[in-house]
């Protein structure tokens, strides 16, 4: 996977456009997300480990918002249930093209990987097959808030008994002091990873109208409203967390 450094916002922009997952972002995405999301490599690797516990023979495993395929590859490496296949979905044509290239290259490096089908599609309109695992890694926060419950409800209906939804998201906090502290700590994380104040400010301007994070409590309440019986937080680093939701 490309290691091109993220310099997208390093020069002053007269007008900062809304963030989109286009070819420019795709080229630098691995570097961008590693330097922007604390704990990201840990989440990705362990998504495969978690999925192996819930995967059932002959079922689909979904990676919704697959981007360049890191989570998909983690699922393929760790899950050993017979007859499983991964369905990786993203609505960005640039992401899908590079995802396919990456996964094809992985096929030549690893043996006994699960088969994968990469789709360019809108997950809001996607008909789900019966599934034992659904992974949404920093995807729901880019869905319009008023469409999130309906999507989660459809995912819940597709999940088989004993399956799981693994949902990773950036969090906001109802407590103002906690929100301010964790926001500043996240900015410190970005600074420590080499982002300038200009880059941080312009990226924030680009993404604030596109990404709408929720509180942990909102996620838990919505998941229960969608029909999930249990919601278990399994990871948090600063204002980024991952949850296991059980049907």
UniProtKB/Swiss-Prot annotation:
Gene3D superfamilies: Vaccinia Virus protein VP39 (3.40.50.150). SUPFAM superfamilies: S-adenosyl-L-methionine-dependent methyltransferases. Belongs to the class I-like SAM-binding methyltransferase superfamily. Cx-SAM synthase family. Its EC number is 2.1.3.-. It is an enzyme of class 2 (transferase). The keyword Lipid biosynthesis does not apply. One of its GO terms (biological process) is tRNA wobble uridine modification. It catalyses: prephenate + S-adenosyl-L-methionine = carboxy-S-adenosyl-L-methionine + 3-phenylpyruvate + H2O. GO terms for molecular function: carboxyl- or carbamoyltransferase activity; S-adenosyl-L-methionine binding. NCBIfam families: carboxy-S-adenosyl-L-methionine synthase CmoA, PRK15451.1. Catalyzes the conversion of S-adenosyl-L-methionine (SAM) to carboxy-S-adenosyl-L-methionine (Cx-SAM). S-adenosyl-L-methionine binds at residues 40, 65-67, 90-91, 122-123, 137, 204. This is Carboxy-S-adenosyl-L-methionine synthase.
């Amino acid at each position: 996977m490309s290691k091109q450094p993220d310099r997208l916002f390093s020069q002053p922009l007269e007008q900062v456009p809304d963030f989109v997952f286009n070819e420019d972002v795709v080229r630098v995405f691995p570097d961008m997300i590693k330097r922007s999301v604390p704990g990201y490599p840990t989440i990705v690797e362990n998504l495969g480990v978690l999925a192996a516990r819930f995967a059932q023979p002959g079922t689909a495993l979904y990676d919704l918002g697959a981007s360049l395929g890191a989570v998909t590859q983690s699922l393929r490496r760790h899950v050993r249930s017979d007859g499983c296949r991964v369905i990786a979905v993203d609505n960005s044509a640039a992401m899908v093209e590079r995802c396919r290239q990456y996964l094809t290259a992985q096929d030549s490096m690893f043996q006994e990987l699960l088969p994968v089908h990469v789709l360019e599609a809108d997950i809001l309109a996607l008909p789900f097959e019966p599934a034992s695992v659904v992974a949404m890694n920093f995807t729901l926060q880019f869905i319009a808030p008023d469409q999130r419950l309906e999507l989660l409800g459809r995912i819940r209906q597709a999940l088989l008994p004993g399956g799981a939804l693994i949902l990773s998201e950036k969090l906001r906090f109802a407590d103002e002091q906690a929100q301010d502290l964790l926001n500043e700590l996240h900015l410190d994380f970005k600074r420590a990873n080499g982002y300038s104040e200009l880059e941080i400010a312009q990226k924030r301007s680009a993404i604030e109208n596109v990404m709408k994070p929720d509180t942990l409590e909102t996620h838990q309440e919505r998941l229960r409203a969608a029909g999930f019986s249990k919601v278990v937080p399994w990871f948090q680093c600063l204002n980024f967390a991952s949850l296991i939701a059980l049907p």
